[in-house]
């Protein structure tokens, strides 16, 4: 999975079918986002909304995973990140299916009256603390501009009755997010706890909520096997994306 085998661009991350430049974005491409983009359920999806799109990674991954009739919209508050996400989308094979909006999700409205079968977000999760080097990075890391209650409210305004709202969070913050979501009328439908190996405790959790009640399916994913190779589960989930897998 190393990118060192070939002379690849250094200002971003090269996947099998697209490139994500992220040098103008506060938060870079990482495993959390890749897991979320590969994991989110897509059955019956016709419209996707990516909240807090950053470089556009999730929008691009969902465009790759879905059919030509699926429209993906990405909303990003930061002007530089939104511009780079738009450039990444335009350079991809799915330029005609991805729209990037530079806007505050609290005020944003879709260009057409519609709701989304899938809403996805890799949200900030740090409470305000030690200042970051730039205000752009503070916005991406801290919940001051997009707290979790507001995120849940915004998702509720845009989702279909049978739709899924998917996030990735640290386990402890994810558990608190679940309780907040339930108090606001959401139902947890899918949960995958992610650990580095089978012997280590989970450090991230992938969550899918719906306005509609139903059975909750839970499982666990180890990224690496006993010999530190990528596990079968991780490989099966991400091999359509990682360049050297």
Swiss-Prot record:
The keyword tRNA processing applies. Pfam families: MTS (PF05175). Its EC number is 2.1.1.223. GO terms for molecular function: nucleic acid binding; tRNA (adenine-N6)-methyltransferase activity. It is found in: Cytoplasm. The keyword DNA repair does not apply. Its main location: cytoplasm. Keywords: Cytoplasm, Methyltransferase, S-adenosyl-L-methionine, Transferase, tRNA processing. InterPro entries: DNA_methylase_N6_adenine_CS (IPR002052), SAM-dependent_MTases_sf (IPR029063), Small_mtfrase_dom (IPR007848), tRNA_Adenine-N(6)_MTase (IPR050210), tRNA_adenine-N6_MeTrfase (IPR022882). CDD domains: AdoMet_MTases (cd02440). GO terms for biological process: methylation; tRNA processing. Specifically methylates the adenine in position 37 of tRNA(1)(Val) (anticodon cmo5UAC). PANTHER family: TRNA1(VAL) (ADENINE(37)-N6)-METHYLTRANSFERASE (PTHR47739:SF1). Belongs to the methyltransferase superfamily. tRNA (adenine-N(6)-)-methyltransferase family. This is tRNA1(Val) (adenine(37)-N6)-methyltransferase.
């Amino acid at each position: 999975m190393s990118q060192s085998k070939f002379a690849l661009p250094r200002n971003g991350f090269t996947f099998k079918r697209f490139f994500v430049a992220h040098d103008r974005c506060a938060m870079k491409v990482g495993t959390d986002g890749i897991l979320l983009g590969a994991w989110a359920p897509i059955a019956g999806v016709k419209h996707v909304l990516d909240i807090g799109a950053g470089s556009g990674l999730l929008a691009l991954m969902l465009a790759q995973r879905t059919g030509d009739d699926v429209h993906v919209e990405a909303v990003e508050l930061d002007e530089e990140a939104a511009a780079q996400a738009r450039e990444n989308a335009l350079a991809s094979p799915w330029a005609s299916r991805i729209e990037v909006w530079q806007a505050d999700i609290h005020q944003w409205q879709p260009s057409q009256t519609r709701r989304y079968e899938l809403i996805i977000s890799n949200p900030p999760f740090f409470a305000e603390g030690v200042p970051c080097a730039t205000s752009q990075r503070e916005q991406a890391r801290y919940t001051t501009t997009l707290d979790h209650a507001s995120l849940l409210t915004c998702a509720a305004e845009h989702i279909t009755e049978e739709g899924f709202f998917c996030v990735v969070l640290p386990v402890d913050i994810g558990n608190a997010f679940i309780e907040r979501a339930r108090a606001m009328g959401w139902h947890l439908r899918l949960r995958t706890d992610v650990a580095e190996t089978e012997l280590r405790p989970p450090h991230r959790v992938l969550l899918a909520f719906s306005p509609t009640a139903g059975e909750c399916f839970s499982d666990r994913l180890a990224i690496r096997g006993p010999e530190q190779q990528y596990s079968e589960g991780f490989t099966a989930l991400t091999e359509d994306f990682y360049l050297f897998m």
